[in-house]
Amino acid sequence: MNTMEIEKTNRMNALFEFYAALLTDKQMNYIELYYADDYSLAEIADEFGVSRQAVYDNIKRTEKILETYEMKLHMYSDYVVRSEIFDDMIAHYPHDEYLQEKISILTSIDNRE
């Protein structure tokens, strides 16, 4: 897998984490098997009794849906920015217990499922 494929896989997995609840069961299953579990199109097609083309089309449509959700809601990009700010604050104020506690609370809110 080349660098671009790895980046796309990581992005799709991240978007899936944020927006999975907005997808249909079929979309969730296909994306999770393809990106998270590294199934091939043929393996997914066999699992669901459909053609590889049907799986491919569904995955491509779902990728666009996930990107559209992100363009409108910015949940993933906002999370990345918050994480970078928290990391920076932790690095610059390692002895400020009050600040560390508040960052910990905010981080736990971001990481709730």
From Swiss-Prot:
InterPro entries: RNA_pol_sigma_r3/r4-like (IPR013324), UPF0122 (IPR007394), UPF0122_fam_protein (IPR054831), WH-like_DNA-bd_sf (IPR036388). Gene3D superfamilies: Winged helix-like DNA-binding domain superfamily/Winged helix DNA-binding domain (1.10.10.10). Might take part in the signal recognition particle (SRP) pathway. This is inferred from the conservation of its genetic proximity to ftsY/ffh. May be a regulatory protein. Belongs to the UPF0122 family. NCBIfam families: PRK00118.1-1, PRK00118.1-4, PRK00118.1-6, YlxM. HAMAP family: UPF0122. This is UPF0122 protein M6_Spy0905. It comes from Streptococcus pyogenes serotype M6 (strain ATCC BAA-946 / MGAS10394).
